[in-house]
């Protein structure tokens, strides 16, 4: 097993941000309060299909800490930023987390410019 954030594939007719919300609800039972596009895209090579995937990263504020875990997962935990950085296996996921954290903790206009109206 490995630890990672909520993730999933875009279904036909979905926008990437809609996929993030659907996966959030399916995997955790949580609802989004606020959402923004992070200043980072993650990418990885997938041998099956011989393709490079480019994945947008989103920051989502949720309505609760009470998670209803889906059957595709075995556990969850809430952790602080440093613990999350140390726990994530993939560099792309760490960089995405760092981008979200940096946008949340800095007082600049990127949060306003990248906000997604729900």
Predicted regions and their residues:
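Flexible, active-site-adjacent loop/turn segments at secondary-structure boundaries
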Residues: 1, 8, 42-43, 67
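Conserved Nudix-box catalytic region and its N-terminal flanking loop in Nudix hydrolases
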Residues: 1-26
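Nudix hydrolase/Nudix homology domain
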Residues: 1-2, 57, 62, 67-118
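Short linear capping/connector segments at secondary-structure termini
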Residues: 5, 40-42, 117
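Short capping/connector residues at structural and topological boundaries
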Residues: 8, 15, 50, 72-74
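Active-site segment of metal-dependent pyrophosphate-handling enzymes
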Residues: 25, 29-65
């Amino acid at each position: 097993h490995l630890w990672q954030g909520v993730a999933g594939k875009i279904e036909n007719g979905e926008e990437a941000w809609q996929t993030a919300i659907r996966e959030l609800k399916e995997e955790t039972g949580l609802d989004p309060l606020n959402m923004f596009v992070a200043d980072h895209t993650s990418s990885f090579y997938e041998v099956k299909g011989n393709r490079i995937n480019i994945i947008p990263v989103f920051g989502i504020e949720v309505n609760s800490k009470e998670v209803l875990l889906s059957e595709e997962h075995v556990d969850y935990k809430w952790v602080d930023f440093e613990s999350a950085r140390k726990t994530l296996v993939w560099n792309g996921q760490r960089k995405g987390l760092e981008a979200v954290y940096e946008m949340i903790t800095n007082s600049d206009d990127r949060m306003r410019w990248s906000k997604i109206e729900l």
